[in-house]
């Protein structure tokens, strides 16, 4: 992290799955130390199967250290449930969870609805304002990694100077195009 920030200061930072509480704390410390900007945290904690991917101590480190340095946090529905302690069944629940996380961590929160069975609508809470980003479920077996791809695209747009809302809109359009074209976004499960 020091090598990157002291060589070419990044215009955005995207953090994905980090399974160690010690690493999470060190990353948060370094992001603060270097006064990083446009930090997107995709708290990868739950596999598509529903299996937990990181230990509870790492979840606690995310809550206590990393989420508070983020400008945008992008949990999916199961991750939003873990981070809020709420059940998310519908649009109102998504809004409530996004608002709760945004207040608690002082950042924008995008709850990704891709785990919903009906649609792929995402709910953003930024500065107390709710914005919905609508998306259709696209029949494509290559959907592993779509959340990571979305958060990476958002980070790239932020680096180019786009607002959070514009970054999300552009990134959803990009991801939808990739899925429609059958682009293989990953094969791991």
Locate the predicted segments by residue.
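Conserved N-terminal subdomain of the carbohydrate kinase-like
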Residues: 1-52
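Nucleotide and nucleotide-moiety/phosphate-recognizing core
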Residues: 22-32, 107, 129, 165-166
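Conserved phosphate/ATP/ADP-binding segment of small-molecule kinases
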Residues: 56-130
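Short, charged, surface-exposed loops that flank catalytic or proteolytic processing sites
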Residues: 87-94, 159-169
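Charged C-terminal helix
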Residues: 165-189
């Amino acid at each position: 992290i020091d090598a990157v920030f002291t060589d070419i200061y990044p215009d955005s930072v995207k953090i994905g799955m980090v399974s160690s509480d010690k690493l999470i704390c060190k990353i948060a410390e370094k992001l603060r130390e270097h006064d990083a900007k446009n930090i997107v945290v995709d708290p990868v904690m739950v596999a598509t199967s529903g299996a937990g991917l990181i230990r509870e101590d790492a979840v606690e480190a995310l809550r206590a250290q990393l989420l508070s340095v983020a400008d945008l946090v992008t949990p999916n529905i199961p991750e939003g449930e873990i981070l809020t302690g709420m059940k998310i069944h519908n649009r109102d629940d998504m809004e409530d969870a996004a608002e709760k996380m945004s207040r608690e961590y002082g950042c924008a929160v995008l709850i990704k609805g891709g785990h919903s069975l009906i649609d792929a609508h995402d709910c953003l809470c930024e500065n107390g304002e709710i914005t919905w980003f609508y998306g259709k479920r696209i029949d494509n077996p290559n959907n592993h990694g779509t959340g990571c791809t979305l958060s990476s695209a958002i980070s790239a747009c932020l680096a180019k100077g786009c607002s959070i809302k514009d970054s999300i809109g552009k990134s959803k359009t990009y991801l939808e195009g990739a899925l429609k074209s059958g682009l293989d976004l990953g094969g791991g499960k």
